[in-house]
């Protein structure tokens, strides 16, 4: 049957109600060896959601019921502080705890400099430097992989998610490919999301590389990721300070003395605007969805009344 008939929708955005990797579901087998039908998706403890690619206002759940999000970045051309900030916002919004993993340590000469840069954007999150191909530093990840815990790997193509998956599994299960040397871009070796049981009892979700990550939720992600800016803003002279030249702006004062970079403030303001924009789109879409449901309900009632006459 069509998937929309297998279980009831529980959200205003139907795409968020479909089962995804990591979901716990109520199922029924049709006969001794028949197909298994999903009747209900149980409430999620966490969900990593992005705005789906394209023009429609729709959330795409990447993984559900995750305890820890491993945000992987390569120490090559993939390394981008603004992308890391975006990943952190979405990870915090998911309800899980983000952990930054810097891969390809064996190919980078100045690791202390790279770590220092990341620490300017990852204020409170753990940072681990590893080499998935060499197996270096991977013992740092053991505390996150205790029995019953679920971890999802998030990152661009070619950052080493599948290589790390194979190492943690202890065998070659996920396909891997080399990164193009000319632009450090990876090839999509993982084409679908897959949940792997690890030998120690944890669950690992490997995901395809993300080419884009637009915000969807408006929870605590911005506050968690940019806590340094929000703390400075509390000392601004005006409560509605926009940090754009107003007198007594503590944020601009911090930039002037080198405590904060202008690029980090710009990133914060850009993500704020994006979040406000998607909230407006969601509100509009929610009203349209509600209108459609009432219209369909009215039509059903009229048809029922006609049949009774």
Predicted regions and their residues:
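Conserved Switch II/interswitch segment of TRAFAC-class P-loop GTPases
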Residues: 32-49, 65-83, 96-99, 105-110, ...
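A conserved segment at the C-terminal end of the G1
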Residues: 161-177
């Amino acid at each position: 049957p069509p998937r929309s008939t297998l279980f009831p929708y529980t959200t205003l955005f139907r795409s968020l109600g479909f089962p995804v990797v990591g979901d716990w579901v109520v199922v029924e087998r049709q006969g001794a060896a028949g197909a298994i039908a999903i009747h209900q998706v149980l409430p999620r403890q966490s969900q990593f959601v992005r705005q789906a690619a394209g023009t429609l206002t729709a959330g795409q759940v990447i993984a559900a019921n995750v305890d820890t999000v491993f945000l992987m970045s390569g120490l090559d051309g993939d390394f981008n502080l603004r992308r890391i900030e975006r990943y952190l916002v979405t990870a915090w919004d998911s309800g899980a705890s983000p952990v930054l993993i810097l891969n390809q340590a064996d190919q980078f000469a100045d690791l202390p400099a790279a770590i220092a840069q990341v620490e300017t954007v990852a204020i409170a999150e753990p940072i681990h430097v590893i080499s998935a191909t060499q197996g270096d530093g991977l013992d740092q990840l053991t505390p996150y992989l205790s029995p019953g815990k679920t971890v999802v790997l998030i990152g661009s193509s070619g950052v080493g998610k599948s290589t790390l998956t194979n190492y943690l599994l202890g065998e070659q299960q996920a396909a891997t490919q080399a990164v193009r040397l000319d632009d450090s871009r990876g090839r999509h070796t993982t084409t679908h999301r897959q949940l792997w049981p690890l030998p120690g009892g944890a669950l690992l979700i490997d995901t395809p590389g993300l080419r884009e990550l637009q915000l969807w939720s408006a929870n605590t992600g911005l506050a968690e990721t940019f806590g340094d800016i929000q703390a400075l803003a509390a000392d601004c002279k005006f409560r509605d300070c926009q940090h754009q030249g107003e007198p007594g702006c503590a944020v601009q004062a911090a930039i002037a003395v080198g405590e904060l970079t202008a690029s980090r403030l710009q990133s914060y303001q850009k993500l704020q605007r994006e979040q406000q924009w998607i909230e407006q789109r969601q509100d509009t879409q929610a009203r349209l969805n509600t209108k459609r449901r009432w219209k369909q309900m009215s039509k059903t009632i009229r048809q029922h009344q006609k049949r009774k006459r």
